[in-house]
UniProtKB/Swiss-Prot annotation:
It is an enzyme of class 4 (lyase). The active site is at D127, E128, Y150. Its cofactor is NAD(+). This is dTDP-glucose 4,6-dehydratase. The keyword Iron-sulfur does not apply. GO terms for biological process: nucleotide-sugar metabolic process; polysaccharide biosynthetic process; streptomycin biosynthetic process. It catalyses: dTDP-alpha-D-glucose = dTDP-4-dehydro-6-deoxy-alpha-D-glucose + H2O.
Amino acid sequence: MTTHLLVTGAAGFIGSQYVRTLLGPGGPPDVVVTALDALTYAGNPDNLAAVRGHPRYRFERGDICDAPGRRVMAGQDQVVHLAAESHVDRSLLDASVFVRTNVHGTQTLLDAATRHGVASFVQVSTDEVYGSLEHGSWTEDEPLRPNSPYSASKASGDLLALAHHVSHGLDVRVTRCSNNYGPRQFPEKLIPRFITLLMDGHRVPLYGDGLNVREWLHVDDHVRGIEAVRTRGRAGRVYNIGGGATLSNKELVGLLLEAAGADWGSVEYVEDRKGHDRRYAVDSTRIQRELGFAPAVDLADGLAATVAWYHKHRSWWEPLVPAGSLPA
């Protein structure tokens, strides 16, 4: 039986990887994908070049807040909602676009999905909604304590989605991932920003004392986790998706310096980010036990492959840097 699947944010880093995986070798043969993206600064149609012309694929340009974005909901069986504004530093400069896309846009999609009788809706979110913790790891039952406008907007979207499940009976499943990395990530994010700066012999900025801790998840593993939730997840359930590799930013920079053949003279310590969460780590026991998911990409191997990709694809990232670069 054919499943018509709407993927929002499909031209972005994670969304495009998800679409390419669905329509690539080993992907489900019965899924017809409608890829929706507004093509704002981080949405790149070249990310979807590999699936252009695929018989089970069509692309629609549209804003999830507007009528064209809502109209594509008609005829869809499932939704995987990845469209979002996602850079914390940008949210500190102007939160309004984050509220518009991540809150109002999510609400608009949920209303449309309910109206059109969509069978299931996967809300793709972030571990940043939990806030910061000193030790241990968050389970899905932790209270939400977002500390940035970005994470607050994502938490709001999560709560709206789960409320639609309770109030309207919409099958909603929420995923919350740790920090992602991999090919085609927009070069304002920490790993690609540092890789591209080091490639050109520039110094890289490291916030505060560099001891803020993050858990890293390769994008290939993330999209496998999303697909596990889409196909086997339970309605009204939240699933953490972690990569299992927890490092301080200073430790991560050390690995990137080594990969680039650079030393610590290439690092410039800068004033810490406002409200910078000290530590993130998620407990992924639920998705492992219930859905059989576990990350497969080793951090060292994944970083090496990511560095190699940015070296090989300068023509992809170089035009993007002047348009939207911020300190990582």
